[in-house]
Amino acid sequence: MRRSLAAAFALCLSAGSACAQEPIKLDVVNDALPKSLTGAPGNPDAGKKVFLTRTLGNCLACHQVTSLKSEDFHGEFGPSLDGVAGRYTEAQLRLIIADPKRIFTDTVMPAFFRNEGLSRVRPEFVGKSILTAAQVEDVVAYLKTLN
């Protein structure tokens, strides 16, 4: 009986927290996110770590970066990110990471900072974004180093 009550209580708590999550609102202006998601600049070193971590950004699974040639598993599906800082503004990079389909409608790149309107999401990730706002800003800061 105690186990049943404990399980029911845990279920109620988890359901309550899932319902309490607010949809992420992005202030898109001209195919860009001009304002930092955190109000502060990102850390390029932390962004590189997110970029390389398979359970976070996992960017090398699809993209190539010459300066990271010592890393394994460079993908060939997405475009090379060499020189990406010269092709896009900081605000454009922020939107491309947060919600790439707003710019590239046919992309298979996931939205790293959305928590609704997604498909094929595992139950434990429903209502959650892949990256936090700070991690998005960190990746943007790292991408800005790729001239």
Stretches found by the model and what they are:
Residues 2-8:
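Sec-dependent signal peptide recognition
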Residues 15-17:
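N-terminal signal peptide c-region/cleavage motif recognized by signal peptidases
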Residues 22-54:
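Electrostatic cytochrome c docking/interface patches
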Residues 34-37, 80-82, 125-129:
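Second-shell loop/turn segments in exported
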Residues 40-41, 64-99, 108-122:
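Gly/Gly-Pro-rich "capping" loops immediately C-terminal to redox-active cysteine motifs
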Residues 45-60, 71-75, 128-134:
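Sequence context surrounding c-type heme c attachment/ligation sites in exported
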Residues 47, 55-66, 93, 109, ...:
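The canonical Cys-X-X-Cys-His
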Residues 94-95, 102-104, 112-147:
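C-terminal capping alpha-helices of c-type cytochrome domains
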